[in-house]
Amino acid sequence: MSTVFIDRKDIEIRVDGNSISFYAKGKKDGSLPLSPLKRVVIVGNVKIETSVLYKLVNHGITVLFLTGKLKYSGILNGPLHNNGLLRVKQYQKSLSGFSLKFAKELIKRKIVSQRDFLSEIREIKKALAMQADRAIEILNKAISNIEVTPISIDSLRGIEGAASSIYFITYSKIFPNSLKFVRRIKRPPKDPVNAMLSLCYTLLHYEIVREIQLIGLDPTIGFYHQFEYGRESLACDLVELFRVNVDRFVYELFKAKHLGNRDFMKDEESGGVYLKKTGRKKFYPLYEQWVQQQRTIWRGEVQGFARRILEEKDIISG
């Protein structure tokens, strides 16, 4: 297991040699060796010794903090990779024509992946064939516009937004009406599907942040997503390539009945819908099983991007 989710209010985490140990009411309640760990996700209010954080960082383990409602709270990584030249070149290219060229490729690939998933949906739900065909036609036009029309990053954002709206209209139709998912709503999510999309996009984002930092890039310097204080803009860029993978995973969670309405709760104050503790226990192992197949793809994409920044054939090392 390369990722561990810690989601117990009564737990205390301590260092025990080259392991982390869990204590409940002063008594040891299990331990994990550090050697296989790459990520620790801490949910809610967990008591953790500073020495544990030191140990995790020194072993190159990323610590992601989420609130009890599974919203992002913070991330702890080790120091940046020593290859400062890569980050210098990244910054230089962010100010050049490379930004627009990369952004066009990025959004074209995203829309192609949306179109291809709509083709799958067409086969999954025969009743949606006509609607899917219309959506596919619109997405094909968007792809053509990116390829042949002189375009700016601002106009590219308009194309991307319109394509995503069309895509989600059809995507929403493959879920049962009982889930009340009709469109993408982010803050707060208003139904179980939106809740899972938001959670999985968040986890994906910080998986990509980790890969970016491991290779030596600066996650805050993006190309399609321009620099914004406090935002990992490069991660926002690269996440676009994999959103459809998340959409497919979320669909499978509900299709296979791993999750249902019973696993979610509504916050009366905000109106948001969130995964309950029982649902989280089901989700964590399913996510880890799915993500094992995805990480090699994500890592390859980040490595390929680093090669483009360096304009070298071989990946950096050391």
Swiss-Prot record:
Cytoplasm listed as a keyword: no
Cofactor: Mg(2+); Mn(2+)
Gene Ontology terms: biological process: CRISPR-cas system; defense response to virus; maintenance of CRISPR repeat elements
EC class: hydrolase
CDD domains reported in the protein's UniProt record: Cas1_I-II-III
EC number: 3.1.-.-
Pfam families per the UniProt record, alphabetical: Cas_Cas1
Molecular function via GO: DNA binding; endonuclease activity; metal ion binding
Transmembrane helix as UniProt keyword: no
Amino-acid positions noted as binding Mn(2+) in the UniProt annotation, renumbered to this chain: 160, 225, 240
Keywords, sorted A to Z: Antiviral defense, DNA-binding, Endonuclease, Hydrolase, Magnesium, Manganese, Metal-binding, Nuclease
HAMAP family from the UniProt entry: Cas1 (MF_01470)
General function of this protein: CRISPR (clustered regularly interspaced short palindromic repeat), is an adaptive immune system that provides protection against mobile genetic elements (viruses, transposable elements and conjugative plasmids). CRISPR clusters contain spacers, sequences complementary to antecedent mobile elements, and target invading nucleic acids. CRISPR clusters are transcribed and processed into CRISPR RNA (crRNA). Acts as a dsDNA endonuclease. Involved in the integration of spacer DNA into the CRISPR cassette.
Entries under PANTHER family matching the protein: CRISPR-ASSOCIATED ENDONUCLEASE CAS1 1 (PTHR34353:SF2)
Alphabetized NCBIfam families for the sequence: cas1 (TIGR00287)
Family: Belongs to the CRISPR-associated endonuclease Cas1 family.
Assembly, per entry: Homodimer, forms a heterotetramer with a Cas2 homodimer.
Designated name of the protein: CRISPR-associated endonuclease Cas1 1
